[in-house]
């Protein structure tokens, strides 16, 4: 059987997430609760159209695959997840990407804190430090 051309394949998005829970959670328990929350919020038809799959999960971080047209619905269903095996838990979506590699590099491999605002040291030295020294 021939393979589908890339233009005919279903497009996917990858959601990097962090699971915050009281106790450690296994991958199978997480998958079960993700599918349950999606089907209870969206209904069986829309949940199947979302094509949600938990691709990777280690410790408290992982990647979920979904259809590119159903990212908002997938994020909403993940937000409704509040308990896993009767213990309190929540899912924090770190970001969305078009490839697994980019999702991993950008959202899951945080090695150092970088502020969002870049500060020019010369500007800081001239304005703010002189005011502090005068006080």
UniProtKB/Swiss-Prot annotation:
Glycosyltransferase among keywords: no
Keyword tRNA processing: yes
Keyword vocabulary terms for this entry: Cytoplasm, Endonuclease, Hydrolase, Nuclease, tRNA processing
Record-listed E.C. numbers: 3.1.26.5
Top-level taxon of origin: Archaea
A single GO cellular-component term on record: cytoplasm
One Pfam family, short name: RNase_P_Rpp14
Catalytic reaction annotation: Endonucleolytic cleavage of RNA, removing 5'-extranucleotides from tRNA precursor
GO biological process: one example: tRNA 5'-leader removal
Subcellular location(s) per record: Cytoplasm
Top-level class of the enzyme under EC nomenclature: hydrolase
InterPro entries the record matches: Pop5/Rpp14/Rnp2-like, Rnp2-like_sf, Rnp2_archaea
Family: Belongs to the eukaryotic/archaeal RNase P protein component 2 family.
Assembly information from the UniProt record: Consists of a catalytic RNA component and at least 4-5 protein subunits.
Protein's job: Part of ribonuclease P, a protein complex that generates mature tRNA molecules by cleaving their 5'-ends.
Stated name of the protein: Ribonuclease P protein component 2
Origin species: Methanosarcina barkeri (strain Fusaro / DSM 804)
Gene: rnp2
């Amino acid at each position: 059987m021939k393979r589908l051309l890339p233009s005919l394949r279903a497009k996917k998005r990858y959601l990097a997430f962090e699971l915050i829970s009281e106790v450690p959670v296994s991958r199978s328990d997480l998958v079960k609760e993700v599918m349950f929350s999606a089907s209870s919020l969206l209904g069986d038809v829309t949940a199947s159209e979302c094509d949600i799959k938990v691709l990777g999960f280690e410790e408290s971080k992982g990647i979920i695959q979904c259809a590119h047209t159903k990212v908002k619905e997938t994020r909403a269903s993940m937000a409704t997840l509040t308990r896993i095996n009767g213990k309190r838990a929540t899912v924090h979506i770190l970001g969305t990407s078009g490839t697994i590699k980019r999702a991993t590099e950008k959202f899951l491999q945080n090695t150092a804190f970088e502020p969002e605002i870049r500060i020019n040291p010369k500007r800081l030295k001239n304005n703010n430090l002189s005011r502090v020294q005068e006080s």
